[in-house]
Regions:
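Glycine-rich anion-binding loops and their surrounding alpha/beta cores
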Residues: 114, 118-170
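Short coil/turn connectors at secondary-structure junctions
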Residues: 2-6, 42-45, 54-55, 59, ...
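A glycine- and small-aliphatic-rich helix-loop capping segment at beta-alpha/alpha-beta transitions
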Residues: 23-36, 91-112, 134
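Short acidic, glycine/serine/threonine-rich loops at helix termini
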Residues: 18-24, 94-99, 127-131, 153-158
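Glycine-rich nucleotide/cofactor/substrate-binding loop typically near the N-terminus or early
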Residues: 1-54
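Acidic, glycine-rich active-site loops and adjacent beta-strand->loop/helix elements
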Residues: 12-16, 88-92, 96, 121-124, ...
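Flexible, glycine/proline-enriched loop segments at strand-loop-helix junctions
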Residues: 45-64, 94, 113-125, 159-163
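Internal active-site segments that recognize and position negatively charged phosphoryl groups
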Residues: 65-92, 121-138
Length: 170
């Protein structure tokens, strides 16, 4: 009634697809259970579409890909889709000071110009404080809607605060 159109983004039959049918979503789930679906981040889009330069020979035949937040946001932003909703974003992993394991979701959030992301915060297995620091460094605003608590995916309050609070969507 508000003009919102759900459009699942994925790699399907070797193409970036925006707006999958229920049957296509079911196919992704079933084939994913058989390891026939690639996890596709921003960096993986070109190789999976080229279908030739992936390091693992068995992956060269893959024509299905579940897009991460970074890949989904890249596609949504290119198409000027104004809102992208997801469960949680990636972030800085615990012990990142030695592993340097930081999700490309954070960089992509700083690049998006046409799309905002609505989510339940950072995945709770991550270092939320460090993730918020990286988002601040990258110039990404975090917004709490009717709350001053930053969520931790499964919980409402991570112990951290968003950078901005809003009480109305208008």
């Amino acid at each position: 009634s508000k003009g919102c159109v759900p459009a699942t983004i994925a790699i399907f039959d070797g193409y970036v697809r925006v707006g999958l049918s229920k049957g296509e979503i079911d196919t992704l789930g079933k084939e994913g259970a058989r390891d026939f679906v690639a996890k596709v981040s921003r960096r993986d889009i070109a190789p999976i579409l080229a279908n030739a330069s992936l390091p693992e020979p068995s992956l060269r035949r893959l024509k299905l890909g579940a897009t991460t937040v970074s890949a989904t946001l890249l596609v949504a932003d290119m198409l000027k889709i104004p809102v992208f909703v997801t469960g949680g974003i990636g972030g800085v992993h615990r012990e990142a000071e030695t592993t340097f394991d930081i999700s490309s979701d954070l960089t992509e959030l700083s690049r998006a110009k046409n799309t905002v992301v609505i989510c339940a915060g950072v995945k709770s297995i991550l270092d939320i404080g460090k993730t918020l620091e990286v988002l601040e460094t990258l110039g990404v605003t975090t917004v709490g809607y009717k709350t001053d608590a930053f969520p931790a995916f499964f919980t409402r309050d991570s112990g951290f605060k968003p950078s901005t609070l809003v009480n109305s969507a208008t």
